[in-house]
C-alpha cells in the first residue's frame, strides 16, 4: 500500500486560495472579482482551514477548486484577456501620437455579452422572478443617485429608464399588493406570475455619497442586474402582448416625467399585417339596415331551406343526451384579469394631486389600483405651454383631492379632501377606509407595516382585544379579592379577641393563618395547575441537553410575550386617554 502524499486529497484538493485562483486564470484581481460576481461564485469556508491551506494558519480566502476549473472555459474570461491586450495597444498608440491607429483600435474595442450567463444562472423564468428583489433595489438606488466622477450620467439614466419600464408594467397590469412608507423609502410588493416581488424606492432627496464605498463592485452588480431586468421585462411585456421597449413621450419626459411619459401599446394596435375584424370592414351604409329588410331576408332563407328538403323523406329526430352528473363541481371558474380586490380599488375615482404631495409615489399607487389622476403640476405645465387646452379642461369628474396641508383655503363642492396616507392604508387593507380620520388637519392613525413582525406584536390583531378582556377580568377578580379581604379585615379590627382565638385554633390544627390569606389572594385555577404539572412531568423525562434547549426557547418566548403585553397595555392606556379627551371635547 502506497503512502498518500500530503496535500493531495481532502480539503487541500477541494479548496483553492484566491491567489492561486488568480494565477490559474491569469487575470487581475479586479477582473477575477467581476467574473465571480457574474457567475455567482462566492468564497467558501472549509471545515479545517489548516488542512485546506496545507498546514498554514494565515487568514486566506478560499474557493471551491471545481468552481475555478469551471471558470477556465468561460467566454467572458477570454474577452477580459482581449481587453487587456487592447488597453496595452491603445496606450502605446496614444504614447506615440498615432491618433488614427488609436481611433481604429477604439472602434474595434472588444465587447462581451452576459446573455449566456443569465441563461445559465436562471434556467426558468420563475427563477429569475424569485431573484428580482436585489436587482430592483440596486437599480432604484442608482436611478435616484446624482452623476459623479465615479458614476456617469449615462448609467443613472439607463437605470432610471429600466425602473420606469418596470413600474409602468406593474401599473398597467395592476399587480401592486402592499405599500409601506418608511424612513428609508417606500417599500412596494407586487405579485408577478404568482411570485411575490418586493423592492425599495428611495426618496428623491439630495444624497451625500460616502467616500468609503467601493463603486467598482457595485457597478459590476449593476451591469449584471440591468441585463437580468432587460430579460425579465422583455418576457413580461411579450406575455402581456405589449411592445418592448415602450414608446416614450419626449415632451412629457422633459416636463413632468414619470410614468405618464411611457406609452404602453399592444402589438395588435401597431402591427399592420393583422387583418381587421369583420365589424370594422363593414361599410357604414351596410350597418344601417331596416327591420323590414332583415325580416324579409330571414323569410327568404327559410323558403330556400324548405325547397332543399326532398319530398317523402321522413324527418328523423336526433337523440338528446343529458349529463348524468348534474353537479357543477368539475367546472372551474376562471379568474378574471383583475381578480384581486386591490386592482379595482380606485377604478371609480378621479384624484386631484396637489403640488405639495409626492407625485411619483401616488401616481404609481393610484394607477396600479385602476384609478385616474390629475396633478396640479401637470396643469401648471399645460397652462404655460398649451393655454387653449388648459381652458377646455373639465374638472367636474374629480372625486377626491389629495392635500398635505393643515387647512384648505377654498374647497370645491363634490370633492372629498383626504391626506396621502388614505391611499396607502386603503391599498394595504384591500378596501376603502373611512375618510373622516384622514381629513386635512386630522391626526392620522399610525401607518403600520403591512408585513408586520413575524410572531411579534400586531396592534390590529384580535389577540389584543382578547388581552383587553382578560385584563379586565383579572382586574375584576382583584377587586373582588380586595373587597373580600376588606370585609374580613373590618370585623377583625373590631374584635381582636376573636382574631386571636382563630389563630390559636389554626395553629392547633397545624395550618398557618397567613397561608390561608395568601391562598385566597392567589386563587389558582385547577386547569392551570394541571397544565403546569404536565409540563413538569415532561421536563423530568428530558435529557440535560433537551432541557437546556427547552429553557432557552421558553426564555425567548417569554421575553417576546412580555414585550407584547407591555405594548398592548401601552396602547390601551393611549386609547383610554384619547377617549377621555374626546368626551371632554
Swiss-Prot record:
Protein location: Nucleus, Nucleolus; Nucleus, Nucleoplasm
Domain BRCT, residue spans: 341-440
Any one annotated GO CC term: preribosome, large subunit precursor
Coiled coil: 460-490, 557-585
Functional summary from the UniProt entry: Component of the NOP7 complex, which is required for maturation of the 25S and 5.8S ribosomal RNAs and formation of the 60S ribosome.
Classification of source organism: Eukaryota, Fungi, Dikarya, Ascomycota, Saccharomycotina
Segments of this protein annotated with the region Disordered: 444-548, 561-585
Protein name: Pescadillo homolog
Keywords associated with the record: Coiled coil, Nucleus, Ribosome biogenesis, rRNA processing
UniProt-listed GO biological process terms: maturation of 5.8S rRNA from tricistronic rRNA transcript (SSU-rRNA, 5.8S rRNA, LSU-rRNA); maturation of LSU-rRNA from tricistronic rRNA transcript (SSU-rRNA, 5.8S rRNA, LSU-rRNA); maturation of SSU-rRNA from tricistronic rRNA transcript (SSU-rRNA, 5.8S rRNA, LSU-rRNA)
Cited PANTHER family: PESCADILLO - RELATED (PTHR12221), PESCADILLO HOMOLOG (PTHR12221:SF6)
Keyword Isomerase in annotation: no
Source species: Meyerozyma guilliermondii (strain ATCC 6260 / CBS 566 / DSM 6381 / JCM 1539 / NBRC 10279 / NRRL Y-324) (Yeast)
Pfam families in UniProt: BRCT_2, Pescadillo_N
InterPro entries according to UniProt: BRCT_dom (IPR001357), BRCT_dom_sf (IPR036420), PES (IPR010613)
Annotated Acidic residues bias: 467-498
Major site of localization recorded for this protein: nucleus
Subunit relationships: Component of the NOP7 complex, composed of ERB1, NOP7 and YTM1. The complex is held together by ERB1, which interacts with NOP7 via its N-terminal domain and with YTM1 via a high-affinity interaction between the seven-bladed beta-propeller domains of the 2 proteins. The NOP7 complex associates with the 66S pre-ribosome.
Family: Belongs to the pescadillo family.
Gene3D superfamilies: BRCT domain
GO molecular function list: large ribosomal subunit rRNA binding; ribonucleoprotein complex binding
Amino acid at each position: 500500500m502506497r503512502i498518500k502524499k500530503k496535500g493531495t486529497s481532502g480539503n487541500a484538493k477541494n479548496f483553492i486560495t484566491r491567489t492561486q485562483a488568480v494565477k490559474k486564470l491569469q487575470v487581475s484581481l479586479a477582473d477575477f472579482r467581476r467574473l465571480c460576481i457574474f457567475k455567482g461564485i462566492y468564497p467558501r469556508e472549509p471545515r479545517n482551514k489548516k488542512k485546506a491551506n496545507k498546514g498554514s494558519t494565515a487568514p486566506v480566502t478560499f474557493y471551491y477548486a471545481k468552481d475555478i476549473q469551471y471558470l477556465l472555459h468561460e467566454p467572458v474570461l477570454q474577452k477580459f484577456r482581449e481587453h487587456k491586450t487592447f488597453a496595452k495597444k491603445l496606450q502605446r498608440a496614444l504614447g506615440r501620437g498615432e491618433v488614427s491607429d488609436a481611433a481604429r483600435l477604439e472602434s474595434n474595442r472588444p465587447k462581451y455579452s452576459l446573455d449566456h450567463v443569465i441563461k445559465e444562472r436562471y434556467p426558468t423564468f420563475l427563477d429569475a422572478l424569485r431573484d428580482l428583489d436585489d436587482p430592483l433595489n440596486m437599480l432604484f438606488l442608482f436611478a435616484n443617485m446624482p452623476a459623479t466622477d465615479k458614476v456617469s450620467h449615462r448609467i443613472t439614466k439607463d437605470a432610471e429608464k429600466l425602473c420606469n419600464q418596470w413600474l409602468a408594467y406593474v401599473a398597467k397590469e395592476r399587480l401592486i399588493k402592499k405599500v409601506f412608507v418608511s424612513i428609508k423609502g417606500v417599500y412596494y410588493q407586487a405579485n408577478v406570475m404568482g411570485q411575490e416581488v418586493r423592492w425599495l424606492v428611495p426618496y428623491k432627496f439630495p444624497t451625500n455619497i460616502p467616500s468609503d464605498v467601493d463603486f467598482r463592485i457595485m457597478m459590476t452588480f449593476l451591469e449584471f442586474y440591468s441585463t437580468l431586468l432587460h430579460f425579465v421585462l422583455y418576457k413580461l411585456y411579450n406575455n402581456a402582448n405589449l411592445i418592448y421597449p415602450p414608446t416614450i413621450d419626449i415632451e412629457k419626459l422633459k416636463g413632468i416625467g414619470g410614468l405618464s411619459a411611457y406609452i404602453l401599446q399592444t402589438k395588435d394596435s401597431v402591427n399592420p399585417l393583422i387583418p381587421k375584424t369583420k365589424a370594422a370592414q363593414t361599410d357604414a351604409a351596410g350597418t344601417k339596415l331596416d327591420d323590414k329588410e332583415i325580416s324579409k331576408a330571414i323569410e327568404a332563407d327559410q323558403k330556400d331551406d324548405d325547397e332543399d328538403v326532398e319530398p317523402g323523406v321522413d324527418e328523423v329526430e336526433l337523440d338528446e343526451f343529458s349529463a348524468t352528473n348534474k353537479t357543477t363541481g368539475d367546472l372551474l371558474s376562471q379568474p378574471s384579469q383583475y381578480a384581486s380586490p386591490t386592482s379595482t380599488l380606485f377604478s371609480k375615482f378621479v384624484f386631484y394631486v396637489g403640488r405639495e404631495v409626492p407625485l411619483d409615489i401616488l401616481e404609481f399607487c393610484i394607477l396600479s389600483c385602476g384609478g385616474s389622476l390629475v396633478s396640479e403640476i401637470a396643469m401648471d405645465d399645460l397652462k404655460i405651454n398649451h393655454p387653449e387646452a388648459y381652458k377646455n379642461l373639465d374638472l367636474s369628474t374629480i372625486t377626491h383631492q389629495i392635500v398635505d396641508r393643515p387647512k384648505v383655503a377654498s374647497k370645491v363642492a363634490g370633492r372629498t379632501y383626504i391626506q396621502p396616507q388614505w391611499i396607502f392604508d386603503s391599498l394595504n387593507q384591500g378596501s376603502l377606509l373611512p375618510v373622516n380620520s384622514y381629513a386635512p388637519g386630522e391626526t392620522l392613525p399610525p401607518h403600520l407595516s403591512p408585513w408586520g413582525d413575524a410572531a411579534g406584536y400586531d396592534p390590529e390583531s384580535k389577540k389584543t382585544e382578547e388581552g383587553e378582556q382578560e385584563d379586565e377580568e383579572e382586574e375584576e377578580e382583584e377587586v373582588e379579592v380586595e373587597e373580600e379581604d376588606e370585609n374580613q379585615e373590618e370585623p377583625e379590627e373590631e374584635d381582636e379577641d376573636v382574631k386571636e382565638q382563630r389563630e390559636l385554633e389554626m395553629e392547633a390544627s397545624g395550618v398557618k393563618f397567613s397561608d390561608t390569606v395568601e391562598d385566597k389572594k392567589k386563587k389558582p385555577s385547577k386547569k392551570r395547575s394541571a397544565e403546569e404539572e404536565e409540563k413538569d412531568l415532561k421536563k423530568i423525562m428530558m435529557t440535560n441537553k433537551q432541557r437546556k434547549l427547552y429553557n432557552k426557547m421558553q426564555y425567548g418566548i417569554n421575553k417576546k410575550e412580555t414585550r407584547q403585553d407591555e405594548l398592548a397595555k401601552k396602547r390601551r392606556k393611549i386609547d383610554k386617554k384619547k377617549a377621555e379627551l374626546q368626551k371632554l371635547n
